[in-house]
């Protein structure tokens, strides 16, 4: 980890990170984080009864548990704004909301109606304006006019699916779905699977998302703010997430190990100089501290922050290159999966930029109208 941050610091005058995803590999010392969190979230409907430590409340926006039988969101109401009457309701036509109408539940309903949650994304994705049923086309070909075509409603206790078809082309379907959600206090509950993954998610107020899988491996999607400047800010954001995450685990799992790790993490946060932060991170790796010793890069992107004032020559890019140009002159390096990958493509990017500058200078010095076609091809296509 310290070597990655050291290199990112070396190039931060030219490149900035955008997407940054990584994993914390499960290890024996931490126990069954997934199972214990599942048990706590499943049995409670108040945020305070899950997250006891009030010091970390401002950092955590929501907890989500999703498996084949149940999806449950527990929200931290204090992290949401007070809505006015003109605040846009996003999801009324997708859901039937059942609530006990208490003040706490009514506030949760208000938040759910206005937040673009994963439940909204799921139900919008499964609603299909047009879908071709190829099995029914086959019936038409082989069965003639006596073929049976389905349209109508299919439903269970929590999901209603309406299938409509055109009388002239009955194999083309329009599918709409409505989902029932039960809102009690801070909890938003629906039955059945509402995601392709069985995970527990911790959504932070800074938009970072931590996904915990059944083996307690974690996938962390680190958010980025517009005011993030350089590697030191990135380290602070990552270790701020660590600090609050590990205190949450200590809260739920009652494992003193996480409190000890949170204290070590806090030393990185309170250090003011980058060199000191990197030194502490290196020491954590040497002592096999959770969060550093089991850190594994998932994928990250870099963007070239300087302006490209010369002509861009796309022909210099390999077909499978991770260097991409967006909107003509925006250079990004995408899907980097290791420090070695990063060093390799940054080096390629630097060399390519220099080659483009040279070609651009030559191109600007010649008369395009009189120059030979072969010479122009050599500049533009090779």
UniProtKB/Swiss-Prot annotation:
Pfam families: Pox_int_trans. One of its GO terms (biological process) is DNA-templated viral transcription. InterPro entries: Poxvirus_intermed-TF (IPR008789). Induction: Expressed in the early phase of the viral replicative cycle. Keywords: Activator, Early protein, Phosphoprotein, Transcription, Transcription regulation. Heterodimerizes with protein A8 to form the virus intermediate transcription factor (VITF)-3. Acts with RNA polymerase to initiate transcription from intermediate gene promoters. Belongs to the orthopoxvirus OPG150 family. This is Intermediate transcription factor 3 large subunit.
């Amino acid at each position: 980890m310290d070597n990655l941050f050291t290199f990112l610091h070396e190039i931060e005058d030219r490149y900035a990170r955008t997407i940054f995803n990584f994993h914390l590999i499960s290890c024996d010392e931490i126990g069954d984080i997934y199972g214990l969190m599942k048990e706590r979230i499943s049995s409670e409907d108040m945020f305070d009864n899950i997250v006891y430590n009030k010091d970390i409340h401002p950092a955590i926006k929501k907890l989500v548990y999703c498996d084949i039988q149940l999806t449950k969101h527990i929200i931290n109401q204090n992290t949401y704004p007070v809505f006015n009457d003109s605040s846009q309701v996003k999801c009324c036509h997708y859901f039937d909301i059942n609530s006990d109408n208490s003040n706490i539940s009514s506030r949760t309903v208000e938040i759910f109606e206005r937040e673009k949650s994963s439940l909204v994304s799921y139900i919008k994705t499964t609603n299909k304006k047009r879908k071709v049923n190829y099995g029914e086309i086959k019936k038409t070909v082989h069965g003639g006019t006596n073929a049976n075509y389905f349209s109508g409603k299919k439903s269970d206790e929590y999901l209603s699916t309406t299938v409509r078809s055109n009388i002239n082309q009955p194999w083309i379907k329009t599918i709409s779905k409505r989902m029932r959600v039960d809102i009690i206090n801070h909890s938003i509950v629906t039955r059945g699977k509402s995601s392709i993954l069985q995970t527990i998610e911790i959504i932070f107020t800074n938009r970072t998302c931590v996904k915990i899988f059944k083996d307690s491996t974690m996938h962390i999607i680190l958010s980025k703010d517009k005011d993030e400047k350089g590697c030191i800010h990135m380290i602070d954001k990552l270790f701020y997430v660590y600090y609050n995450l590990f205190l949450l685990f200590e809260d739920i799992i009652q494992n003193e190990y996480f409190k000890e790790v949170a204290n070590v993490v806090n030393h990185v946060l309170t250090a003011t100089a980058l060199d000191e932060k990197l030194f502490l991170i290196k020491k954590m790796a040497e002592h096999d501290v959770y969060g550093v010793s089991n850190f594994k890069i998932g994928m990250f992107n870099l963007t070239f922050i300087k302006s490209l004032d010369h002509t861009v020559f796309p022909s210099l890019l390999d077909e499978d290159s991770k260097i991409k140009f967006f909107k003509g002159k925006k250079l990004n390096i995408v899907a980097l999966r290791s420090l070695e990958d990063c060093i390799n493509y940054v080096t390629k990017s630097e060399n390519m930029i220099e080659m483009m500058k040279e070609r651009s200078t030559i191109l600007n010095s010649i008369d395009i109208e009189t120059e030979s076609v072969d010479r122009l091809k050599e500049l533009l296509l090779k």
